[in-house]
């Protein structure tokens, strides 16, 4: 057996040793065909091929399936473990050119540009108000919900049910079933059978027991877990039994039921990162971090190259369906959008949005920054296209991704009425507290 694995390793090393040499070749021919010592030193050592490693792993798996499981380590186990360790070590050394013993130079890390329009995409926890990175938000929200149990266990358990369980259909089914239990208790307060819930009941097991937070909810609203005898059965089973205090206040059960039905998952909100800049010639220059893209920068370049080649080949043959498919692919490429709005005084208002957010969210963002938020205004894209405050259209559908510069103007008819009355709109349209934090765009 040991010889078998030695042969596998020898075969792997033989395949990676490079081209062979004939014994009849002259020294001159060997020198011509071979590489110089300096070049050989620069060439990193080649590890076993993927096919060879897979073959060795498959052989090990077949052998392990055929051999009965021993009670203790055997000599064959030791051999297999040793071979596996050696193969893994060789694979690691071949896949890690920067490891000691190799001559490869490690690739330099990508430097973050100091001129990014925003440092990244951030979120705000609705429970704590803490600003979070995307990779921090889920863990932080879970911890915040768990911490809430000490102050309001009912609300915390409801949040846990709706947030920790991702399958929305399963959550709805479980919540509706819990609501039915509570309805029966409220409608039939004298019926003792409705005040006990059998934990091994099929409906409870399939719809409720699988939901994180469901047990905490029952205990928080007054149920206690007890073991009771079951009629016509020898053993005992666990039940949730409504406590005396909860029975005396049935209106609380009705309130908790409605809270459970009306609740939504706790989600971090996107931080708009509202910023105001002085007038700048760099207003249309956007350097975005990788967070703004669904694909990595390398994947975006590759997709652009492939798309260019496809367009050149099929420019005269593309159908309407192909064009629509291409447009949909383009829309899905971006996750976020950075929008700047140039105001009448030249200042710039900047905010971060989801690429699929509606135009109404953009208009609301601008309106909340104005001194006179009751005055109607217009937003126009760089090509002069007027944007409508539409609940149906999203930013990516209007070409405002991954970044856009818009122009703000007051509604012309309203502006004429103001001037006809002998008044003029304020030169600065933004709220004073925003102007106090104005920055220089760089």
Swiss-Prot record:
Residue ranges of domain PUB in the record: 175-244
Molecular function (Gene Ontology), one example: ATPase binding
Keyword Phosphoprotein: yes
Renumbered residue ranges of the record's region VCP/p97-interacting motif (VIM): 51-63
Compositional bias of kind Low complexity: 52-61
Record protein name field: UBX domain-containing protein 6
Assigned keywords, A-Z: Cytoplasm, Cytoskeleton, Endosome, Lysosome, Membrane, Nucleus, Phosphoprotein, Ubl conjugation pathway
Disordered, as annotated region: 13-111
Comp. bias (Polar residues): 90-105
Comment, domains: The UBX domain lacks key residues critical for VCP binding.
Coiled-coil ranges (or none): none
Gene Ontology process terms (BP): endosome to lysosome transport via multivesicular body sorting pathway; ERAD pathway; macroautophagy
Subcellular location field: Cytoplasm; Cytoplasm, Cytosol; Membrane; Nucleus
Region named Mediates interaction with LMAN1: 1-10
Phosphoserine PTM sites in chain numbering: 36
Annotated CDD domains: PUB_UBXD1, UBX_UBXN6
């Amino acid at each position: 057996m040991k010889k078998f694995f030695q042969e596998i390793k020898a075969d792997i090393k033989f395949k990676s040793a490079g081209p062979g040499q004939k014994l009849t070749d002259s020294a001159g021919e060997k020198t011509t065909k071979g590489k110089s010592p300096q070049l050989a030193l620069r060439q990193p050592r080649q590890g076993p091929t993927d096919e060879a490693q897979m073959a060795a792993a498959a052989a090990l798996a077949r052998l392990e399936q055929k051999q009965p499981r021993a009670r203790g380590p055997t000599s064959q186990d030791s051999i297999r473990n040793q071979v596996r360790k050696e193969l893994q070590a060789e694979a690691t050394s071949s896949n890690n050119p920067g490891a000691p013993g190799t001559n490869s130079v490690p690739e330099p890390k990508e430097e973050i540009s100091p001129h990014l329009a925003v440092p990244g995409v951030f979120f705000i926890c609705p429970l704590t108000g803490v600003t979070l990175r995307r990779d921090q938000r889920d863990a932080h929200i879970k911890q915040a919900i768990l911490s809430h149990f000490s102050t309001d266990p009912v609300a915390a358990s409801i949040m846990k049910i709706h947030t920790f369980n991702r399958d929305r259909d399963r959550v709805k089914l479980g919540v509706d079933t819990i609501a039915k239990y509570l309805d029966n208790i409220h409608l039939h307060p004298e019926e003792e059978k409705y005040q006990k819930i059998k934990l091994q009941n099929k409906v409870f097991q399939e719809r409720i027991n699988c939901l994180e937070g469901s047990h905490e909810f029952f205990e928080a609203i007054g149920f206690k877990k007890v073991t009771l005898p079951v009629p016509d059965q020898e053993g005992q089973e666990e039940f949730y039994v409504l406590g005396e205090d909860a029975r005396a206040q049935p209106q609380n059960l009705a309130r908790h039921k409605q809270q459970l039905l009306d609740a939504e998952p706790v989600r971090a909100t996107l931080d708009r990162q509202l910023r105001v800049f002085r007038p700048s010639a760099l207003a249309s220059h956007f350097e975005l971090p990788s967070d703004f893209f669904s694909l990595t920068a390398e994947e975006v370049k590759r997709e652009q190259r492939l798309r260019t080649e496809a367009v050149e080949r099929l420019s005269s043959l593309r159908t309407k369906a192909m064009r629509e498919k291409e447009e949909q692919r383009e829309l899905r490429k971006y996750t976020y959008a950075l929008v700047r709005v140039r105001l009448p005084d030249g200042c710039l208002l900047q905010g971060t949005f989801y690429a699929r957010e509606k135009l109404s969210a953009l208009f609301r963002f601008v309106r909340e920054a104005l001194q006179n938020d009751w005055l109607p205004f217009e937003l126009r894209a760089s090509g002069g296209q007027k944007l409508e405050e539409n609940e149906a259209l999203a930013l990516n559908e209007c070409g405002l991704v991954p970044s856009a510069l818009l122009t703000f103007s007051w509604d012309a008819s309203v502006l004429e009425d103001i001037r006809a009355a002998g008044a003029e709109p304020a030169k600065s349209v933004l709220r004073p507290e925003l102007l106090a934090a104005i920055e220089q765009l760089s």
